[in-house]
Amino acid sequence: MPKLKTRKAAAKRFKATGTGKFTRRRAFRNHLLDHKTPKQKRHLATKAVVHETDELRVVRMLPYA
């Protein structure tokens, strides 16, 4: 059986944790930050865990993660 290819775009966006879950960046932190509160921006700076309904998609894109 041939080796499975990793989706490079996904590999740059998701990181596997020790427990097998995946972390991701939060949206809404690239531009238009003037009107957002510092608390909001701090919250957006933290990593989020990929939701369980999307986890299978990420696993398929990253077969060796």
From Swiss-Prot:
The keyword Ribosomal protein applies. GO terms for molecular function: structural constituent of ribosome. InterPro entries: Ribosomal_bL35 (IPR001706), Ribosomal_bL35-like (IPR021137), Ribosomal_bL35_CS (IPR018265), Ribosomal_bL35_sf (IPR037229). SUPFAM superfamilies: L35p-like. GO terms for biological process: translation. Signal peptide: none annotated. GO terms for cellular component: cytosolic large ribosomal subunit. Keywords: Ribonucleoprotein, Ribosomal protein. Pfam families: Ribosomal_L35p. Gene3D superfamilies: 4.10.410.60. Belongs to the bacterial ribosomal protein bL35 family. This is Large ribosomal subunit protein bL35.
